[in-house]
Structures are given as C-alpha cells and as structure tokens.
C-alpha cells in the first residue's frame, strides 16, 4: 500500500517541504484548495522530487475545463508523468459566496467537466477532433496555435472526490479514480460507497479495474501522552467542522449520530469552535479517524482499506506532527503490505 500526504501549500515552502517528505519515504504528495492556490505548489514540487503529485482537490465548478486541461497537461509534463488531476465540487455556499460562481446539479456538472477535459486531452493527443457539446459547456475550437500536441507521458488520470451516492456513481461512470472523502467510516464506506461504485460501473459498462479507489483518512498520531492529546484535539476539531456541514450528515446518520449535525452547525454559526470539538467523543474519534502510535495507525489503515485499495491519502490536521512519526507510519504500512 502506498501512502500520500499533504504538501505545505505556501509557495515559498513547497519545494523544500516536498524534498523533506520524499526523504521520509512517502509515495505521493497532494495539495488542497485552501489558503493558497492548489496547483502552484505542485509546480515547485515537480522539479524537486520524484514522487507522485495530485490536487486533492481542485474545485472544478468555478473553472473552465480548458483551464483545467492546460494546467493538468503541463503538470503532467513537469512531473514526468506523475500527476493526477483530482477534482471536487465543494458545497453550495462556497461556490456561490466565495467563488462567485453558479451552483446547480453538481453531479451533472462534474460529470460534464470530467468528460470535457478528457475530450480536450483526446484532441491534443491526436485521437479525435475537439467536438464536445454538453449542457453546461461547449468546446469545439482548437486551432494549431493553441494545441500543445501529444504529451510525452500521456494525459494525466482524472480523479473525482465524492461522498454521497450520486457523486460516487458519477465518479465510477466517468473518472479514472475516486477520492473517498476523509470524513467517513468503515460502515459508511461498505454500506453506501461501495454499492454506489458498483452501480456506477455497471451503468457505464466498466469494470472494477477501470476505477482506482483512493480512500482518505484523518490521522491523529504521536508517541507521548502530550503528543497524542495534541493530535486528538486537532482531529476532533476537524471532525466537528466536517460534522457541522449538512452535506456530510449521511456519514453521521449511518453511525447513529445524525442528531449531532444540527447541534454542531448551530455552534459553528456563532463561532463556538472549541465547544464543537468537545462534542466529538472518543467513539466518534476512533470511528471517523485513526488515532494512536504510528504503528497502531498503520495497522488500522491497512485493516480498514487494504481490501479495497493499494493507496491511501493521510491527513494530519491541526497539530504538530514529527517527521519521524510520518516515516514510521509509512514504514509500518509497507511492512504490513509487502
């Protein structure tokens, strides 16, 4: 099993941190669309390390498929074939109020964006003329001046982030990979995610081998009591943030904790973030995340996801983690999955 970890998104830190993480033995690095651009750190990392790189995720709805295609194609070249384009839809308030973009039928739009980017790639690879005419976007013009030509490493795979059944089915129908959202549980994955994957593959006439599955897991790790307590606080805060979002309530519902979501949401609206974290008890912590020593976390990751995937994305949220603990976790996963 391969382990990907998050790259520091600050442009001035990305290359140096990429080298440090690569030396720890990680297999890949990913960025998320937070306080910094999601693509720029990977430009720096591509020239600094030889590990795999991925956006996890680039918010697709405010962007043109042509913009996404150009950036992904160039990152594929810079990374010498080690880039994956991870796309996500975000939720309505962010799309409308932060990005100032239109929100409607997110799964249908994401499906069309993935297909449009693939059509653009096919045109550049010389496989077909560009003629994509969809409901939301149209791309039918590609003069030679704007055509980069075939990529020496081939077009990058496109992964789609999903949690609910509709978006998960969409990913299984059209994407090369599924990024399983980190706010998840084993029960939700088995009862909700896997059936949606199978349904999407069946609809599209695809096979399991056509879709790479990348589970994402929230990790709280340390060795001393103080380190584990700090990790617990960081993880609880992130779980409370996710849990306050109505779109993520289905995960809580599966575990019988659905009534917690409106309580968390109400606290978030008045800025009571510390109180939100206090509502995440130990059972929730160990169900929705993994917590313990690096070796204990590695064993739990393999137990949860080893039967479904050979690659997992790990988050270490809101607490100072020692580089040695990352290296130990990666080494332990490799020992358990030779």
Q: What is the predicted function of each stretch?
A:
Residues 1-338:
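Active-site-adjacent structural elements that line small-molecule/cofactor binding pockets in enzymes
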């Amino acid at each position: 099993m391969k382990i990907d970890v998050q790259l520091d998104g600050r442009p001035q830190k990305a290359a140096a941190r990429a080298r440090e993480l690569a030396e720890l033995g990680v297999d890949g690095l990913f960025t998320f669309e937070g306080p910094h651009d999601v693509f720029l750190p990977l430009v720096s990392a591509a020239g600094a390390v030889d590990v795999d790189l991925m956006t996890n995720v680039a918010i697709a709805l405010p962007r043109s498929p042509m913009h996404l295609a150009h950036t992904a194609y160039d990152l594929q070249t810079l990374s010498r074939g080690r880039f994956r384009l991870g796309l996500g839809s975000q939720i309505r308030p962010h799309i409308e109020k932060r990005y100032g973009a239109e929100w409607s039928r997110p799964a249908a739009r994401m499906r069309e964006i993935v297909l449009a980017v693939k059509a653009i790639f096919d045109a550049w690879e010389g496989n077909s003329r560009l003629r994509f005419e969809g409901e939301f976007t149209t791309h039918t013009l590609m003069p030679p001046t704007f055509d980069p030509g075939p990529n020496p490493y081939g077009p990058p795979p496109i992964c789609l982030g999903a949690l609910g059944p509709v978006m998960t089915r969409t990913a299984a129908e059209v994407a090369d990979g599924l990024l399983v959202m980190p706010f998840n549980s084993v029960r939700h994955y088995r009862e909700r995610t896997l059936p949606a994957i199978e349904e999407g593959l069946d609809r599209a006439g695809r096979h399991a081998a056509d879709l790479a599955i990348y589970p994402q897991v929230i990790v709280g790790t340390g060795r001393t009591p103080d380190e584990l307590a700090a990790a617990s606080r960081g993880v609880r805060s992130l779980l409370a943030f996710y849990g306050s979002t109505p779109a993520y309530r289905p995960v809580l519902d599966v575990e019988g904790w659905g009534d917690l979501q409106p309580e968390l949401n109400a606290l978030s609206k008045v800025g009571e973030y510390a109180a939100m974290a206090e509502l995440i008890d130990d059972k929730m912590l160990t169900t929705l995340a993994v917590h313990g020593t690096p070796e204990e976390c590695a064993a739990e990751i393999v137990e949860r996801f080893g039967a479904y995937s050979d690659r997992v994305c790990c988050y270490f949220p809101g607490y100072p983690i020692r580089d040695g603990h990352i290296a130990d976790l990666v080494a332990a996963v490799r020992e358990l999955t030779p």
